[in-house]
Each structure stands twice: as structure tokens, then as C-alpha cells.
Amino acid sequence: MLDKEKKAEIINKFKLHETDTGSPEVQIALLTERINRLTEHLQVHKKDHHSRRGLLKMVGQRRALLNYLMKKDINRYRAIIEKLDLRK
């Protein structure tokens, strides 16, 4: 789980305007941070299958948001991919 400060920091970094908390970019950035933390957890706790299922659900949710953004605005999609270093 993300603490308030870390979540606010991510929102401030990726927001499009002053009151933005729910744009696809912000949602993708928050999901990426949660995915990274959960991945570290699963490397230590290999048999935690309940958390692994949650990880797969989050990855799918992020993938759906990325697909939406790619269809809606390819430039914003490319920017978020580069900023978060998601593709090789």
C-alpha cells in the first residue's frame, strides 16, 4: 500500500492540471508504483499466491489504461511510457 506522501508525490509529478487526480497518466503511475512494490514483496514471499493474483489484476488494469490512452492520444501514451520506463 502507498502512504499518503508517496501517493501525493506521484500525483503531483504526473497531473495534467492543478486538481487532476484521476487522469489516465496519474492512474497508470500509481498502478506502476504499486506493481513495483508488490513485485519486490513477491520476490521475498514466493508462495504468496493471493498477492500474485492481485498483481496480475493490477497489471491488467494498467494495460487497459495504456490501451485507452494509446487510442485516445498517442503522444500522451508515448510520454507516459518513456517517463515510467515501461517498454524496452
UniProtKB/Swiss-Prot annotation:
Subunit info here reads:
Part of the 30S ribosomal subunit. Forms a bridge to the 50S subunit in the 70S ribosome, contacting the 23S rRNA.
Protein name listed in UniProt: Small ribosomal subunit protein uS15
NCBIfam families referenced in this protein's UniProt entry, alphabetically: S15_bact (TIGR00952)
Instruction: Write out the coiled-coil annotation as residue ranges.
Output: none
The entry's keywords: Ribonucleoprotein, Ribosomal protein, RNA-binding, rRNA-binding
GO cellular component assignments: cytosolic small ribosomal subunit
Q: Which InterPro entries match?
A: Ribosomal_uS15, Ribosomal_uS15_bac-type, uS15_NS1_RNA-bd_sf
- Which Gene Ontology BP terms does the record give? translation
Species, as recorded: Caldanaerobacter subterraneus subsp. tengcongensis (strain DSM 15242 / JCM 11007 / NBRC 100824 / MB4)
Q: Which GO terms describe its molecular function?
A: rRNA binding; structural constituent of ribosome
Question: What's this chain's function?
Answer: One of the primary rRNA binding proteins, it binds directly to 16S rRNA where it helps nucleate assembly of the platform of the 30S subunit by binding and bridging several RNA helices of the 16S rRNA.
Q: Does the keyword Magnesium apply?
A: no
**Family under the similarity heading:** Belongs to the universal ribosomal protein uS15 family.
Gene name of the record: rpsO
Q: Which Pfam families match?
A: Ribosomal_S15
